[in-house]
A protein has these predicted regions:
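Positively charged n-region of N-terminal signal peptides that target proteins for export
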Residues: 1-4
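General helical structural elements
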Residues: 6-7, 24
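Bacterial N-terminal signal peptides
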Residues: 7-16
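Boundary at the C-terminal end of the N-terminal hydrophobic targeting segment
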Residues: 19-23
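Conserved beta-alpha junction segments in alpha/beta enzyme cores
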Residues: 26-124, 128-280, 284-310, 317-437
Length: 437
């Protein structure tokens, strides 16, 4: 009888635990219940991992196609609508870049299908060096070029990618639901300037060594959080200014940014984490190669950096959230950047400014922008609104050096631009920002 008396309470306790485990999840708690749910937001995503092992992007020394998959690659879309019905679509890609021709084709289709003006489309790439080659030239390859398997694979993949991007953008628009937006930023410390210290005299033992711990960095982790009116977290758009180059193997992977997104999503069913690359043209993750940390592989380093970044995003989402209200305003223009060699035609370079009411200004620049741009733009636009600066957006045409780097020389200065491109680009940022005031 005593044994039965003991078994019954234990059974009841087990039943209660089972009911608790199988019951409704705890009620959502808003991080900022005082902020009006004045937006509509929608998310969608698609796997964009190549279906076959084609050539990889990022490292010129690669001599064969991919051989495996460490992680799926994704395209993700966030659609936002303010109270006046103005919409913005943001697309992030776990890929090397956003070819300008691809961006223009997607923009034209979204305008035709959904009435989204080209200025209200942002496309950003993580710049993972463990993704596929893309067709970077705007025109389709010729029949002769298509005889080359590498060219043919890149073109076929890029065509399929375009269809998936258009599809997820449309799905995100269809998913528009009432939402509350908040933002803030945290810090993450693994990004370091990868250029040598040009202030050291020739002959100094460290004159030609990188990284440069004293070099300029932007280690901010901005995060725009989206939650339902009831307080349930639906997604986050977050950024970091650093190359995705922990890895050098022959497997598909999103690198540290892919793992940061995975970690943010894994314990939140239905949650979408989207990574936006900052001005990381001269920034690398450190440590970043096997042997630097005994017993730790490249993949483990990518995962560790991903965890560090995800932890910073968690802090940015939860610590002192700043309410974001409308209106939504966006401006986009392309400026003409000349090359040193006059026979080379100038390049149309995209500059975009998106203002989220009076709370946040997002500046996006094309291609591999060095960190000087982010630091300068944040300094010059400083005011009541937060300032977030992204690179690798809407274009992929090589490195965009600052005036300082053009003067110093080195890897990031070798693209061949004429001088003063920094003044042209930053000047356009100020013009667009002033237009939206």
């Amino acid at each position: 009888m005593k044994r039965l008396a003991l078994i019954l309470p234990l059974a009841l306790l087990a039943g209660l635990l089972l009911v608790r485990a199988q019951g409704d999840k705890p009620a959502a708690v808003s991080v900022a219940p005082h902020v009006p749910a004045s937006w509509k937001a929608g998310f969608a995503s698609a796997v964009v991992t190549p279906e076959k092992y084609i050539w990889m992007a990022g490292y010129a020394a690669r001599n064969k196609p991919a051989e495996g998959k460490a992680q799926e690659l994704h395209a993700k879309a966030l659609a936002l609508e303010d109270e006046a019905g103005v919409r913005q679509v943001i697309v992030t890609l776990d890929l090397i870049g956003v070819p300008q021709g691809l961006r223009r084709r997607v923009a034209a289709r979204l305008e035709a299908d959904h009435g989204i003006p080209p200025a209200n489309l942002l496309m950003n790439a993580s710049h993972t060096h463990s993704g596929p080659e893309l067709r970077r030239r705007p025109e389709p390859p010729t029949e002769e070029e298509l005889k080359n398997e590498k060219v043919r694979d890149a073109w076929e993949y890029t065509q399929g990618l375009e269809e998936k991007i258009v599809a997820i953008a449309g799905a995100a628009i269809a998913d528009l639901r009432p939402a509350r937006l908040t933002w803030n930023q945290a810090r993450c410390g693994f990004a370091m300037n990868r250029r040598r210290d040009y202030t050291l005299p020739e002959g100094h033992p460290n004159a030609n060594k990188a990284p440069n711990p004293a070099g300029p960095v932007d280690q901010a982790v901005p995060a725009l959080r989206v939650e339902s009116p009831e307080g349930e977290a639906r997604g986050v758009l977050f950024g970091y200014a650093c190359h995705n180059t922990c890895l050098g193997f022959y497997e598909w992977c999103g690198d540290y940014a892919g793992y940061a997104q995975e970690y943010l999503e894994q314990h939140r069913p239905g949650f979408t984490a989207m990574f936006v690359t900052g001005c990381g043209g001269d920034q690398n993750p450190y440590p970043r190669r096997s042997g630097v940390v005994p017993g730790v592989s490249d993949l483990e380093l990518a995962q560790q950096h991903g965890r560090s970044l995800a932890n910073a995003v968690e802090m940015a989402m939860s610590a002192n959230p700043i309410g974001v209200e409308g209106p939504l305003r966006s401006a986009y223009e392309e400026v003409s950047l000349a090359y040193e060699k006059a026979e080379r035609p100038p390049h149309s370079y995209p500059v975009q400014v998106i203002k989220f009411g009076d709370a946040l200004t997002l500046v996006t620049l094309g291609s591999e922008v060095v960190v000087d741009y982010s630091l300068r733009i944040k300094r010059e636009l400083a005011g009541p609104a937060g300032v977030w600066v992204a690179g690798y957006s809407n274009d992929y045409s090589g490195y965009i050096p600052s005036e300082r780097i053009q003067e110093e020389g080195g890897y990031e200065a070798a693209t061949g631009w004429a001088r003063r491109i920094e003044e042209i680009i930053v000047g356009k940022v100020h013009e667009l920002h002033g237009r939206l005031e």
